[in-house]
Swiss-Prot record:
Binds 1 Mg(2+) ion per subunit. May bind a second metal ion at a regulatory site, or after substrate binding. One of its GO terms (cellular component) is cytoplasm. It is an enzyme of class 3 (hydrolase). One of its GO terms (biological process) is DNA replication, removal of RNA primer. InterPro entries: RNase_H, RNaseH-like_sf, RNaseH_domain, RNaseH_sf, RNaseHI. One of its GO terms (molecular function) is RNA-DNA hybrid ribonuclease activity. The keyword Isomerase does not apply. This is Ribonuclease H. It comes from the Bacteria. PROSITE patterns: RNASE_H_1 (PS50879). Belongs to the RNase H family. Disulfide bonds: none annotated.
Length: 154
């Protein structure tokens, strides 16, 4: 069996107000190829945008890969590497029996992982890490897109 291609992904989410207009950004690197993705929502939260960055990046992969995914969100990293197992056992409820927040996004992220071998990494945000800074800029650009869409819709 051949080895899976290795892809490195950097993600970030941002929100102007929480909730408020938000954006997400992702950088996918495969060998010497690089792809940037971003998007936004008119009314969202920072955690939702952090999740959307990871979901969108993983869903963009066209075949199974080994993925090193870097996020500055402890919420995403801890949620997907730890908390999610208990949530699934408890019918998507927290330890104190409350519904998991952002459950649709967590379920979508869980589904996006199935085809891949993902190693999750945390990187300190706003600490000069070039790819994280670029993902942050893409996320902020996503906020601008969301605001423009809002103006067009009004």
């Amino acid at each position: 069996m051949s080895e899976l291609p290795v892809v490195t992904i950097y993600t970030d989410g941002a929100c102007s107000g929480n909730p408020g207009p938000g954006g997400w950004g992702a950088i996918l690197k495969f060998g010497d190829k690089e792809k940037e993705l971003n998007g936004g929502e008119r009314h969202t939260t920072n955690n939702q945008m952090e999740l959307m960055a990871a979901i969108s990046a993983l869903e963009a992969l066209k075949k199974p890969c080994t993925v090193d995914l870097y996020t500055d969100s402890q919420y995403v990293r801890q949620g997907i590497t730890g908390w999610i197992h208990g949530w699934k056992r408890n019918g998507w409820r927290t330890a104190d029996k409350k519904p998991v927040k952002n459950v649709e996004l967590w379920q979508r992220l869980d589904a996006a992982l199935k085809a891949h071998q993902v190693r999750w990494h945390w990187v300190k945000g706003h600490a000069g890490h070039p790819e994280n800074e670029r993902a942050d800029q893409l996320a902020r650009d996503g906020i601008v897109k969301a605001r423009l869409q809002q103006r067009v819709a009004e």
